[in-house]
Amino acid sequence: MSQVSRRKVLFVTSELADLVKTGGLGDVSAALPRAMRHLHDVRVLIPGYPQVINSGNPIHIISQLGGHAALPPCKVGRMDMKDGLVIYVLICPELYEREGTPYADSDGRDWSDNHIRFARLGLAAAEFAAGEVKSQWCPELVHAHDWPAGLAPAYMRWRGQSTPSIFTIHNLAYQGTVSTASSRELGIPDEAITPEGMEFYGKLSFIKAGMAFASHITTVSATYAREITTPEFGCGLEGFLQSKANKGQLSGIPNGIDESWDAATDEHLICHFAPNEWTRKEINADYVRELFELDASTGPLYAVVSRLVYQKGLDLTIGVAEHIVNNGGQIAIIGRGEPEEEDAMRELAARFPGRIGVRIGFNETDARRMFAGSDFLLMPSRYEPCGLSQMYAQRFGSLPVARNTGGLADTIEDGVTGFLFKESTIESYTEALNRTFQVFAHRELLNAMRCRAMAAPFNWHQAVEPYADLYRDLLKKNVSISSNY
């Protein structure tokens, strides 16, 4: 990594695992700023959801911001986390203080004004970068994450700001599209509603706005960065992304996982263990079997820890479940998501009582215990930008069985730390599962693979170094541009 000077960086995100999260975005938004802090002064801007306002962390109001078009006025508060991370909270009760998730109500219906809610977040980031927030701290670079923050680089560009920006794609399939009729209420200039701007098949796309107007685009694995330039994974944006890649404006930087994922120290586990302490790992397995009402067994235990959505390939797991059970295996499933996927999981468990168990919902403690207690993690994703679960599992000696795509391809060494299969078919998946049966029957090989998996270097240093280099390059270019005025 090249030498860098300490600069001010604002992360813009809709989730932060400390306070509110629905998936990997929240984990990354919490971990990466902390990993970067020894190099830069990194702070985070997030909406003031009830989970944030009521977190027990004091919030001190530092500024008021006016409205713009249909975007209402709001306040900015500062929250200092116990470890020193500074969080700026965008306080606007009419937009954010609602029961449910950051994106949907308690029944899972998307908020009808999400375009207003997250446009306000993007505008606040631009106002921050322009020095309009009354604070002694002003970012020199803005790093926006996924579609909810997509308008941050866009508003910065439309307002004529020279502050460089990065837009990170965590999942291209979630694009934040809205009717072009909303352009006036969002204050979007007509010249931005073009194929080169944020127009996408007759609609406005927040994720495309981020990609179009940011100084640089990243995504969360090298393989996914290549995949999204192809029709199979590009979600209709492959041509646009290929043009960015051709200009050197698209790169893949892998996520890491934090140091709490350590089987020897994790406070959530029933029993700590180190490599080769497999009888202690079995104590965690016994807990998982009891939690999911599975029969006592010495056969392989497979875990599913996932959002229950089509992307995750859960229909494939349903298709191979009987094969797993017939070979002496059991499956424990935890997650929440689309109602039809949740119902399918319940029906699967009902078909195989004592062999397959499901818990709809998500609990961090139980998820960690599942990684620690299982022998294998099932992850047949149709696509996976990065994925974190396969890294969590390996750290706890659970070998992932995953499709060879995106970040899964980059973080699993086939036959060494896990099992990869190529096609998104039951046949290809079954071939990989047959290999798990063979390995499980040969304990010396199983334990050797577990040891290699637990030693895999999934830390944030792998992401910090390339991001630090990218920050330096963008800030250097910005100085050169500014000096020409």
UniProtKB/Swiss-Prot annotation:
InterPro entries: Glyco_trans_1 (IPR001296), GS/SS (IPR011835), Starch_synth_cat_dom (IPR013534). It comes from the Bacteria. ADP-alpha-D-glucose binds at K21. It comes from Pseudomonas savastanoi pv. phaseolicola (strain 1448A / Race 6) (Pseudomonas syringae pv. phaseolicola (strain 1448A / Race 6)). Belongs to the glycosyltransferase 1 family. Bacterial/plant glycogen synthase subfamily. It is an enzyme of class 2 (transferase). The gene is glgA. GO terms for molecular function: alpha-1,4-glucan glucosyltransferase (ADP-glucose donor) activity; alpha-1,4-glucan glucosyltransferase (UDP-glucose donor) activity. Synthesizes alpha-1,4-glucan chains using ADP-glucose. This is Glycogen synthase. Keywords: Glycogen biosynthesis, Glycosyltransferase, Transferase. GO terms for biological process: glycogen biosynthetic process. Its EC number is 2.4.1.21. Pathway: Glycan biosynthesis; glycogen biosynthesis. It catalyses: [(1->4)-alpha-D-glucosyl](n) + ADP-alpha-D-glucose = [(1->4)-alpha-D-glucosyl](n+1) + ADP + H(+).
